[in-house]
């Protein structure tokens, strides 16, 4: 019994010694109470571009020539994706809360590139030289946010005349059927304007053949009273009625009805 009590006391001795010596450890207070970094300190960690006000000068510098040469900024960029088929849309943005994601797009990876309507040499790299169409985002690899900025900057540069674009003049290869076909031609004038001409040409009188007339005469020999000729050129015109005759007919009308 005494041996078991002695063993338990010996087992607890090192733990007690640790607690007794814990007051000798000095913990620095600055590790526990730290000041939160201000916004200015966090922003200062992000590299500031010296070409922010004049972004076109960076494309003329030696640093740009050594890095890109004569190729576009998106020429050597490759997207990271799972599988062999890349997604149809790029990421929304590459910079979130002043932190750059892994493998950023060609514009976000270089902090000295700025999308501006005055930076014509950069905008020309994202426009097809033959058709003038802006390259879509999966082709160049830029994120959706930068692609939207590029589209707005290109349109603004075209409005200011900084970015030249050609509007081709295409001549019609086929004939113009707006006035050549009879169904879409101008409406002919009224019959009253053209004397003796019908509204449509097939309404005009056509003399039947003599052979057909002789056959009909033999067929209806006992029933024909008189032969009718062509219709008159114009209907007989009624003489104009005087106001007195018109009033008399108006008065006799109700009496005859009675």
Swiss-Prot record:
GO terms for molecular function: structural constituent of ribosome. Pfam families: Ribosomal_S18. It is found in: Mitochondrion. InterPro entries: MRPS18B, Ribosomal_bS18, Ribosomal_bS18_sf. The keyword Ion transport does not apply. Residues 1-35 form a transit peptide. The modification Phosphoserine is found at residues 38, 49. One of its GO terms (cellular component) is mitochondrial small ribosomal subunit. GO terms for biological process: mitochondrial translation; translation. Its main location: mitochondrion. Residues 245-258 have a biased composition (Polar residues). Residues 229-242 have a biased composition (Pro residues). Keywords: Mitochondrion, Phosphoprotein, Ribonucleoprotein, Ribosomal protein, Transit peptide. Residues 214-258 are annotated as: Disordered. Component of the mitochondrial small ribosomal subunit (mt-SSU). Mature mammalian 55S mitochondrial ribosomes consist of a small (28S) and a large (39S) subunit. The 28S small subunit contains a 12S ribosomal RNA (12S mt-rRNA) and 30 different proteins. The 39S large subunit contains a 16S rRNA (16S mt-rRNA), a copy of mitochondrial valine transfer RNA (mt-tRNA(Val)), which plays an integral structural role, and 52 different proteins. mS40 has a zinc binding site. Belongs to the bacterial ribosomal protein bS18 family. Mitochondrion-specific ribosomal protein mS40 subfamily. There are 3 mitochondrial isoforms of bS18 in mammalia, localizing to 3 distinct sites in the mitoribosome. bS18m (bs18c) binds to the same site as bacterial bS18, mS40 (bS18b, this protein) binds to a novel location of the 28S small subunit, and mL66 (bS18a) binds to the 39S large subunit. This is Small ribosomal subunit protein mS40. The lineage of its organism: Eukaryota, Metazoa, Chordata, Craniata, Vertebrata.
């Amino acid at each position: 019994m005494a041996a078991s009590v002695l063993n338990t006391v010996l087992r607890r001795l090192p733990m007690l010694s640790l607690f007794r010596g814990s007051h000798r450890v000095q913990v620095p207070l600055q590790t526990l109470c730290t000041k939160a970094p201000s916004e200015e300190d966090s922003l200062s960690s992000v590299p500031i571009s010296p070409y922010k006000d004049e972004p076109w000068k960076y494309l003329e510098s030696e640093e740009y020539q050594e890095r890109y040469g004569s190729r576009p900024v998106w020429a050597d960029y490759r997207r990271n994706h799972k599988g062999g088929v890349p997604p149809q849309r790029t990421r929304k943005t590459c910079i979130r809360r002043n932190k750059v994601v892994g493998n950023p797009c060609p514009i976000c990876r270089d902090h000295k590139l700025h999308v501006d309507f005055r930076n014509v040499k950069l905008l020309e790299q994202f426009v097809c030289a033959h058709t003038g169409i802006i390259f879509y985002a999966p082709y160049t690899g830029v994120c959706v946010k930068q692609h939207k900025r590029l589209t707005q900057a290109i349109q603004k540069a075209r409005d200011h005349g900084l970015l030249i674009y050609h509007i081709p003049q295409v001549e019609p290869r086929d004939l113009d059927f707006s006035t050549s076909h009879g169904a879409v031609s101008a409406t002919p004038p009224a019959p009253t304007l053209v004397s003796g001409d019908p509204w449509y040409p097939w309404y005009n009188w056509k003399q039947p053949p003599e052979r057909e007339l002789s056959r009909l005469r033999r067929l209806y020999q006992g029933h024909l009273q008189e032969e009718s000729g062509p219709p008159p050129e114009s209907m007989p015109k009624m003489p104009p009625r005087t106001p007195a005759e018109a009033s008399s007919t108006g008065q006799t009308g109700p009496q005859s009805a009675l």
